[in-house]
């Protein structure tokens, strides 16, 4: 039996939930939203408590837990590639950092043929439309959107303030809003958390409104096998429910919208016969349309941590001890406050490591505890760390189908650290971070350098540390890029080249990765394209000012000059 809808959306992540909500605002428009994972159980603290962000990455209930092929420039490591599974997608398991990217990211996209209306001032109204910021709207921020954004408050951990001050003392700008007039510099970091201290996933922000509409049908545990075509027109999808092998078909009167993310969107297109013909033929998949860019141009952010012992008992180390956790959990559960109500990434920054970068190429997240992002290898003492990563690596990877079976994972290769620029940026980044960490603001707190450690100094030693310890920031993107060149997959409205009734709308359509975390840009992209699908006039361009570094020096004179090996 085949059901019929106006639109079928594959993937209930940050983009899919945005589209499902906006499309069903129009009376009578019917939407089927398919999600391979399960519901977002509101009583599961693992996905609802911000401070528990490491938990959903463990196991496979909420995480696809992909792995890369052996990465050739990383000692052949198979690197983890976590992706969200369940209503909310990766917004259900991410670190909740609300970072939009740099204005220059979007202005740069808009220089590409066919993407002229992706300038920052074209995108800013859609960032605002999606957002409700807890301290109210302004030219940069929204006050009525589905995404709850919480700003850091006075009285939070003193290490956040010390780390920002250290960045300023090292000669970098101070910014009061990393999503406002000026991204460059050090300052407080906003988070997607509700006023009650809950994770603000897109399932909570968007679907809680939309699922009350009779025109929206949500099916969980629905793994899409393929998009169905008549000629070059997408007319529906075929999917599996749970562990059953029986295929269910649904028809789309208007469009099929693929919102499965930078790994699964190209995988689904390839399985459906849209992709590089040679690859499809090698797997006996009939070619519907030869599109060589599907799965190519894959990008990500790589990062590593510099960890320090803390000489005062102000870090979050006690919260890692089991006997302190019940009280933290109770305060969060009943009051929505306390340590549990924050992702603990409440300060960060963006800098240019060299003058040839026109906008920041290094991002910092500061964390007032020394531990791996996935919750492993917690240092058994008071400590703090800086996450440091490069933003626009020239390295490019790919996603390739390995079989026709929808349950099989694809072959993923990011090709991390494939260029000399990558190594230069990470070496510079480690050395600049050490200089920041040696500034007077951290004197009351800074103990020994735990990692990499004082003996890791030469280029060769740093490179070895990077190869062994750098890890993904979980920002895969760009594998179905927008544009008009021969490797582009979609146009500036997400429509797949050479096809009718088929769009891709998610982080995979970014042509070049943005400067920062990807959840906010992904929601913006979906908000913007939703207006196109609905035939609405785009929101008027913003007239807000924004910072362009121009000839400004990368930084001023540091308060404390630090020699290359000083610790």
From Swiss-Prot:
It catalyses: choline + A = betaine aldehyde + AH2; betaine aldehyde + NAD(+) + H2O = glycine betaine + NADH + 2 H(+). It is an enzyme of class 1 (oxidoreductase). The active site is at residue 475. One of its GO terms (biological process) is glycine betaine biosynthetic process from choline. Keywords: FAD, Flavoprotein, NAD, Oxidoreductase. One of its GO terms (cellular component) is membrane. It holds the Pfam family GMC_oxred_C. GO terms for molecular function: betaine-aldehyde dehydrogenase (NAD+) activity; choline dehydrogenase activity; flavin adenine dinucleotide binding. The keyword Flavoprotein applies. Its cofactor is FAD. PROSITE patterns: GMC_OXRED_1 (PS00623), GMC_OXRED_2 (PS00624). Pathway: Amine and polyamine biosynthesis; betaine biosynthesis via choline pathway; betaine aldehyde from choline (cytochrome c reductase route): step 1/1. FAD binds at residues 6-35. SUPFAM superfamilies: FAD-linked reductases, C-terminal domain (SSF54373), FAD/NAD(P)-binding domain (SSF51905). Its EC number is 1.1.99.1, 1.2.1.8. NCBIfam families: betA, PRK02106.1. Involved in the biosynthesis of the osmoprotectant glycine betaine. Catalyzes the oxidation of choline to betaine aldehyde and betaine aldehyde to glycine betaine at the same rate. HAMAP family: Choline_dehydrogen. Belongs to the GMC oxidoreductase family. This is Oxygen-dependent choline dehydrogenase. It comes from Pseudomonas fluorescens (strain SBW25). The gene is betA.
